[in-house]
Amino acid sequence: MEQIKAMGGKKGIVGINEAIAPDYAMITEVLDVDQSPMAKENDPKLKALDNYNTELLWEVYQEPRLKSGSALKELNSASDALILQYYEQPDTLEAAFGHNISRKDWEKIAHVKDTYQDVLFTAPIVAANVAHPLIQYMYDELRSPDRKFTFLVGHDSNLSSVATALGVEEYELPNAIEKKTPIGSKIVVEKFLGADGKEYADINIVYQSVDQLRNMQLLDLDNPPMIYPLTLKGLEKNADGLYLMEDLNARFEQALRDYENIK
């Protein structure tokens, strides 16, 4: 819990919420919360939107989750729904319920969901625990001499926890309103055999741009997805931007040890 509180600085959990208060305000503006029947009736449930004392729930063998009744919990659901509406509704005015908002404003809306993911899945001790099954599977697959291609399907929470467990440096994706794990994004690890006989690895996050998503564009060689290189803390890339495979394997092994250390 202390690692999560540290994300908000001296104010801890409250500090996390205060940092995204403008993003909360954007969501409530788009939803016309102040004009809603609940607001007119002074429904006490709306007090949750001003509650910055986010509470986390922990259960053995379960992923962490947030207790209902806080701004982050309730407005994350709204953020998620609005993001999908923005992707699916061609008319941006209609997507925002008649509000003329900018791409930057949509980034604010999506930032609430990004923060929610960070709180739940990117504290180092949480990531090491939650990501462990995937880290083990990926490690085994990457070391399999006969494996040519492996495709794993998961959730944005899986991407967040795996990236943290592997020590990926902070990043913000271009041409995306979701800056870390856009819908449909994938972490792609490629292996190469160098002319020197050594194995190398490239690690990127691959995703569709906002326009590709909103316009439902087919992806091909003439219209490829976005590819953003991920950087692993403490590891050096060569001139081609690749890591030594033995260094990447060592990073996976460290992530596996991190899990063992918290058992």
Residue ranges with predicted function:
Residues M1-T150, G154-K263:
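Signature for phosphate-centric chemistry
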